[in-house]
Design a protein with these regions (language model features):
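N-terminal subdomain of nucleotide-sugar transferases
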Residues: 1-54
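Nucleotide-sugar-dependent glycosyltransferase catalytic domains
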Residues: 29, 40-181
């Protein structure tokens, strides 16, 4: 029987990558070969936890996140401006990231994707015959208390609960639209 390989793909801040290290260690303890594909800036973090590292891209995500451009984008109150801004930050790295995802998924039977790797990762999984699994450590269920993780929170004012629930439904529609293209 061929060796079961699971590729975890996670990009973003360390807080977005760290839960996948924990997941990888659990899968590894269950006897599964695990690869964690992420930005090269997390290579030592991944390997010091005993996981196989694969580079998605040579992107210093911490530097991008701390840039004045990123701070200005994150300060916006307009969800569409936020999405456009985030895409403008990642667009220059997209082809390199997609190539890295394809390499990391080679021979894998499952690709577990975080929200920031779902767009290219889903297609890479399908191309290579790996089952794509979406894994979210942020709340993705519509709720009154929190908005979608992909939009800025609204200040505490009347109507905030409606806004919070609506952001989740809008993101579900956008994700559905993306996968039907």
């Amino acid at each position: 029987m061929p060796e079961k390989i699971v590729t975890l793909m996670a990009t973003g801040s360390r807080g977005q990558v760290q839960p996948y290290v924990a997941l990888g260690k659990g899968l590894q303890a269950a006897g599964i070969r695990v690869r964690l594909a992420t930005a090269s800036s997390y290579a030592s973090f991944v390997t010091e936890h005993g996981l196989e590292f694969h580079k998605i891209a040579d992107v210093d995500t911490q530097s991008i996140a701390q840039s004045d451009e990123a701070k200005a984008i994150m300060a916006t109150k307009d969800p569409l401006t936020l999405l456009r801004g985030v895409f403008s930050l990642i667009r220059p790295h997209f082809q390199e990231s997609l190539d890295g995802m394809l390499t990391a998924l080679d021979g894998a039977s499952v690709g577990i994707l975080n929200p920031l790797t779902q767009y290219g990762g889903y297609d890479a999984c399908k191309k290579l015959g790996a089952k794509p699994v979406f894994s979210y450590v942020q709340s993705m269920i519509p709720m009154k208390k929190l908005p979608s993780a992909f939009v800025p929170p609204m200040p505490a004012i009347p109507g905030q609960a409606v806004y919070n629930r609506l952001t989740h439904h809008i993101m579900l529609l956008l994700r559905s639209y993306n996968h039907n293209m």
